[in-house]
Amino acid sequence: MAAEDTPEWEDDAQPAARSSDSSGPHLWLVPTPVGNLGDITYRAVEVLRDADAVACEDTRRTGALLQRLGLRRPLVRLDAHTMYRAPQVLEQYPRLAYVSDAGTPGISDPGAELLREALSRDIPAEVLPGATAFVPALVLSGLPTARFTFEGFLPRSGRERRERLGTIAARPEPTALYESPHRLHATLLDLAEACTPARPASVSRELSKRYEETRRGTLAELAEYFAQGVRGEIVVVVGGRTEAEAEDTAPDWDSVTAELAVQGLSTRDLRSALMQRGLSKNDAYALALKHRADR
């Protein structure tokens, strides 16, 4: 590495010390390990140690983590059901650290709502770098990673789930998503139907733990492999749509739109129907307007 390319790191203790020396209100979003306690950072420990209190989704889980780290701080439950208490908690504990059950807060958890509340009150906020599950899973998938989309958790059922599956199927870049063990098999089957059974994908579970596993294959192969169930936290990565796949499966959208338009659908319903079939939002809207105008 050339001298001019050398990273300009600050001293390990400086970022935490800079914030901790301030006496004013402050919110820290602190990543916690997704499985291996050794993944906690020095800075995360310092912030947890110096905060007035630690807000979290599960006080028992976070209490066990703090005990392992040798820390004793007041714990406040702030999850999806108790986030209405955020204004009160921010006032009671001006220097507040927030952790999720695992990984980086603010992604697929209530931390984002707490952050918005703090920002609305002009409270300075920091997000510490640290552990997350979908980035290691994305890299381990072996799929191209220059561009990707993170979906979080899919809707469990209904039109919104179908629309999201159609959007995933149409993307040229890989998609990473979280799934629970008891829904994994059904989701893999739905993805195989939406994306074609031959679409490459991977399933990673128990990342950073003793029984970590990443299984790669087609969606059909993965659905068969995990048909008997699985345990652990799961990340699914689905490969992007290839040009050849797009050419083989691309429908005649004008014909599809014309068939739907004769049913008397409104422009909004027509657009929604096209999106359910995998067309992008902008293209669906343009076709819906065109066919409504032709009638």
PLM region spans:
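A contiguous loop/helix-start segment that scaffolds small-molecule binding in enzyme catalytic cores
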Residues: 2-17, 24, 95, 174, ...
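Glycine-rich, flexible N-terminal cofactor/catalytic loop recognition
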Residues: 2-81
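Short amphipathic alpha-helix with an adjacent loop that forms part of the alpha/beta core around
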Residues: 16, 85-92, 167, 226-227
